[in-house]
From Swiss-Prot:
GO terms for molecular function: RNA binding. This is RNA-binding protein KhpA. Belongs to the KhpA RNA-binding protein family. A probable RNA-binding protein. It comes from Chlamydia caviae (strain ATCC VR-813 / DSM 19441 / 03DC25 / GPIC). PROSITE patterns: KH_TYPE_1.
Length: 78
């Protein structure tokens, strides 16, 4: 699922080499922490958050087939 997420994100941004995804696994939960270049954050979020909502919907659909809950968080680069 991490590769699927990376594929989607890297095709949306201008700097795919700066996309980093950290996977934190719990018992029945997976949290993906997404870090992208500052100029690309707006592209990931999209107008009124529509793009990130669509990405999260896709992840939830894939995860539900495996009986896992999934969460996607956008981390700010400091």
């Amino acid at each position: 699922m991490k590769d699927f997420l990376a594929y989607i994100i890297k095709n949306l941004v201008d700097r795919p080499e700066e996309v980093h995804i950290k996977e934190v696994q719990g018992t029945h939960t997976i949290i993906y922490e997404l870090t992208v270049a500052k100029p690309d954050i707006g592209k990931i979020i999209g107008k009124e958050g529509r793009t990130i909502k669509a990405i999260r919907t896709l992840l939830v659909s894939v995860a539900s087939r495996n009986n896992v809950k999934v969460s996607l968080e956008i981390m700010e680069d400091k």
